[in-house]
């Protein structure tokens, strides 16, 4: 009689293993208040190009493969916010332009401010 040892793998372990394979390893450390430049893949017809989107990170959410950042910038006098999934294939590159010094986890108060009041102090130690 040969006893077979069958390894039981739960569904959650399979999902976690798959998600860990899909994570991008080369992402920089991003903090709320940082000014970042995100390279977004745009497909027009059969052409693909990378369009830069630069702004201030006003929120970070979730973790792992579902991690997102909300980036706000002013375009032609109007505030524009975009939410990026960091591990998405649509995000081609991510570069921190400058570090920001803030004391909040979410910077939603920047939505109500205009002009120079929307600036974030620069941090030099990170």
Swiss-Prot record:
GO annotations of cellular component type: cytosolic large ribosomal subunit
A single BP term in Gene Ontology: translation
Role this protein plays: This protein is located at the 30S-50S ribosomal subunit interface and may play a role in the structure and function of the aminoacyl-tRNA binding site.
GO terms of molecular function: structural constituent of ribosome
Keyword tags: Ribonucleoprotein, Ribosomal protein
Protein species of origin: Prochlorococcus marinus (strain MIT 9312)
Similarity comment: family membership: Belongs to the bacterial ribosomal protein bL19 family.
Protein name: Large ribosomal subunit protein bL19
């Amino acid at each position: 009689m040969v006893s077979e040892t069958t390894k039981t793998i739960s569904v959650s372990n399979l999902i976690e293993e798959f998600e860990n394979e899909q994570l991008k390893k080369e992402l920089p450390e991003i903090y709320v208040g940082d000014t970042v430049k995100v390279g977004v893949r745009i497909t027009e017809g059969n052409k693909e190009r990378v369009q830069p989107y630069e702004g201030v990170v006003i929120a970070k959410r979730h973790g792992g493969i579902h991690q997102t950042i909300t980036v706000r910038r002013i375009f032609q006098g109007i505030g524009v916010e975009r939410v990026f999934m960091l591990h998405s294939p649509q995000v081609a590159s991510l570069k921190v332009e400058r570090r920001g010094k803030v004391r909040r986890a979410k910077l939603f108060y920047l939505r109500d401010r205009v002009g120079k009041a929307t600036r974030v102090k620069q941090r030099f130690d990170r």
